[in-house]
Each structure stands twice: as C-alpha cells, then as structure tokens.
Amino acid sequence: MNQHFHRGILFYHQAAGQGNLYKSLGQVTESLTQMCDDLTLKLSEEGGDIAKFCDDLTQNQNGVSYDVFFVLGGDGTVNELVNGVARNNLEIPIGIIPGGTFNDFTKTLNLSPRTAAAANELLNSKIKSFDVLKVNDTYALNFAGIGMMVQNSENVDANKKRILGKFSYVFTTLKVIANPKIYQYTIKANNEEYSGETSMILIANGNYVGGSKIPLEDLSPSDGEMNIFVFKNHNMSLIKDFFQVKDSLRWNDITENIRLITTDEMKLETRPSTKIDIDGEIMFDTPVDIKLLKDKVKLLYIDVNE
C-alpha cells in the first residue's frame, strides 16, 4: 500500500542533486506529490536553516504543521534535519533522498543511491523508529569518530570532491593510512575503562560508513546499542581485518588489530585532544560523552522482506 500524508515539506540544499539540482527536484517532486496532498519546498541557504525551522515549528512560529519531512542532500544536510527533529522531540517521520557523495544511511534504509529512484521507492515505504547517537549536545544518525577518518575529511580538496566524488576520498585515504596520527585514548563504558594507542576510533550506529558496509553481521541501528571500533595499529593488515565479516560475539577472539566494544553510553578522552567527525561534520574536540537514544527518530524505509 502506498504511503500517503496530508502535508509534507521537502528540504534541499543548493549543492544537492548529484550535479543537477533542478532536474533532481523535478524528478523528486513527481513522486512526493503522489504521497502528499500538500507539498512545500524549502531551500536551505545556510547551515542551521533546517534545524532552526524545526525549532520554530515546535514553537508554532510557522503557523502550520506537517506530518512528514523529506530531505534531499548529502549526509551533512540529513544530519542537520535529524538534529532539528531530535532536539525538539518531534514525532514527524523523515524520508531521506540521496543527493550527496555517499548518503550512507540510505543504504541502511534499503533505498537506491539514485535520486529519482529513491524518491519513487518512498511511495511504498514503511515507517520505523531508529536509534540516534547523542554526542555531547549534538545528534548523529550514522556514526561518530576520531583519527584517520577526520584526517581524511580534512584533507579532501573541495574541487576534487566536486569533480571526482567518491574517488577523491579513496585517494586521500591511501595517503592517510601511510601517515596517520596516533593518539592515547581512554574509553569508559560498561563500568570498565579501556585505554591504549589508536589511529582511529569509529562509533557506529548505522551499517555503512564512507560508502562501505561495516562487516558486523549483527550491527543494527535499532538494537539500543552503539558499536565502538578501536583501531589498534595502522598497517595494511588492519584494513584486511576490518573487512572480514564477523559477529560481535566472535569479533575480539579473531581480530587482533581492532577492538570491539558494545554499549549504550560511553565517555571518550584522548591525548592530545582531537577533532571528532559526526556524520561527516567536524564540530568539536574530545573529550566527549556519547549516549545511544533508543527509537529517537522515525524514518521511511523499504522492507526488503516483502
């Protein structure tokens, strides 16, 4: 049965649409107008516009109400909407339409990476509650991390990203692996303390990061737990270890280079202090407190079992 809503709003960014914004908007609205009696398009001109819209909506400053949100853009645009919804405790479901380089969480939602196809698939979507990471006072749908992933993001040239897309990250990743920064870390979780040296720590809620699937069979963004991957060294065997599929019960028994910690709350400290990547946005430095908020947002997804 097709999804149908009374009033919806589509947020989009000027850089969305995978190279052709207005063509993408036309394709997307063709599907979304079939889902909504009333559809509004809202351009995000500056960072923070979408979150502020959610703040104003909570205070009823907009004078209208909506029963579905859509967002066309990359992970950063999606992250802003998730923050606006989560911090205002809105119960409005979100439909994510890929319009950036990776759009990792759309893979978790079983949506096509192609803009028009994903919008069309939403016609037959279902609504499901998903967990969210709270990193200090910021929310993350997919991941948070330090180390090589931050180096990678900071070193990607904006022009190369525009021209090469995903390949720009590949080139930068190879350089970072060859010369990573090493940190002393302390993690407090599960009434225990973990410490040592690391080149990267990934705190995952979603199944995909940087366009690649995390090889943990029982990882789920709806299980009430976050999965912390601590990369102990930085040689090429680390990469081989990470991409061998395992389950959480056997991970630490068969993987020497990457420690797995599963929890719903943690504190991370590093020496020296370092920047943290939150769903592709680098916002502040360690130390950080991270909590897993169960069923915090509602998203449209495709049930592949039907």
Curated annotation (Swiss-Prot):
Pfam families: DAGK_cat, YegS_C. One of its GO terms (molecular function) is ATP binding. Its EC number is 2.7.1.-. The active site is at E281 (proton acceptor). Residues 3-139 form the DAGKc domain. Mg(2+) binds at S220, D223, E225. One of its GO terms (cellular component) is plasma membrane. Its cofactor is Mg(2+). Binds 1 Mg(2+) ion per subunit. This ion appears to have a structural role and is required for catalytic activity. May catalyze the ATP-dependent phosphorylation of lipids other than diacylglycerol (DAG). This is Putative lipid kinase Sca_1050. It comes from Staphylococcus carnosus (strain TM300).
